[in-house]
Design a protein with these regions (language model features):
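Residue-level recognition of beta-strand->loop/alpha-helix junctions
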Residues: 87-89, 154, 197-199
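Short, conserved phosphate/pyrophosphate- and ester-handling motifs at nucleotide-, phospho-/glycolipid
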Residues: 223
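Alpha/beta-hydrolase-fold catalytic nucleophile elbow
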Residues: 117, 153-154
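Conserved SGNH/GDSL esterase-like catalytic core that processes O-acyl groups on lipids
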Residues: 51-53, 59-134
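Short "lid" loop at the C-terminus of a central beta-strand within the Rossmann-like core
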Residues: 156-159, 201
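N-terminal secretory targeting modules
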Residues: 1-53, 235, 241-262
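A short helix->loop->beta-strand "cap" motif at the edges of active sites that frequently abuts
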Residues: 146-149
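Substrate-gating cap/lid alpha-helix
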Residues: 161-197
Length: 262
């Protein structure tokens, strides 16, 4: 026979869980209302000398930037003034969707570089690590067959985004580590492939030091400052991007550290 105290504790626990779920659901609903409808940045200069393809999810679109020119694609156009920027990303994409995005353009244009920002939706939708590895290998194979250098930019600390409440934030942080580990493993030592690591030590991570200054109003996507930080990491870590920059714009290249277990 159950003691009366256990029944009361169960009711309190159920009420607490219900309140937490309602609060988190309300935050997600509010975030969806606040998510801007940024258009994909595309650019064709007067005399393009090479073509950069940008693909992936809403972060490749530039959701949260406010101005498409302040997205990663927009900043690439500013830095690579003689480059045509072709953006085929769409919000909600997972890694499995990226090859479909690229097949539409690789057969039509002569791309000199492909930058893929993707993986967040694989974290949020619980794509298994095995499937992440398969999807990344398919993406890499497509780029290699097209002879296009590939730069992969997986997400940073998704669980640390202000949108999420504990313990969901902890779960998403754990999930993000698994997805990143699978992605890095699939890309390891692949010819023509670089991976940019957006996960920085806590003391050096501006997203954790000053979240209000780097996250958009939805509490999930970067804002213009946040995309600026991502772009700086892209420039510092990617040899393929640095090679295409004017000499004055090149930064000291950072040796990529596999900080997967922190």
């Amino acid at each position: 026979m159950n003691a009366p105290g256990w029944g009361r504790r169960g009711l309190v626990a159920a009420a607490t869980l219900g309140a937490w779920a309602g609060w988190q659901a309300a935050r997600v609903k509010r975030a969806r209302r606040r998510t801007d409808r940024t258009d994909r940045f595309r650019h064709v200069p007067d005399d393009p000398r090479h073509c950069v393809v940008v693909a992936g999810d809403s972060t490749a679109v530039g959701v949260g930037a406010g101005n498409p020119r302040l997205s990663v694609a927009g900043r690439l156009a500013l830095a690579l003034r003689d480059a045509r920027i072709v953006n085929v990303a769409h919000s909600g994409a997972r890694l499995a969707d990226v090859p479909h995005q690229l097949r539409r353009v690789f057969g039509l244009i002569d791309a000199s570089l492909c930058v893929v920002l993707c993986g967040a939706n694989d974290v949020l939708r619980f794509t298994s690590p095995a499937r992440v590895r398969r999807n990344v290998r398919a993406l890499i194979g497509l780029a290699q067959r097209a002879d296009v250098p590939l730069v992969l930019v997986p997400p940073g600390h998704i669980g640390a985004a202000p949108l999420w409440l504990p313990p969901l934030s902890w779960l998403l942080s754990w999930r993000a580590r698994g997805v990143r580990r699978a992605l890095f493993g699939a890309a390891h030592k692949q010819s023509g492939v670089e991976v940019v690591d957006l996960v920085l030590p806590a003391r050096k991570d501006p997203f954790r030091a000053a979240p209000a200054a780097h996250y958009a109003a939805d509490g999930l996507h970067p804002n213009a400052n946040g995309y600026g930080q991502w772009f700086e990491q892209l420039v510092q870590q990617s040899r393929a991007v640095q090679h295409r920059l004017p000499p004055a714009r090149r930064a000291p290249r950072v040796q990529l550290a596999h900080r997967l277990f922190r």
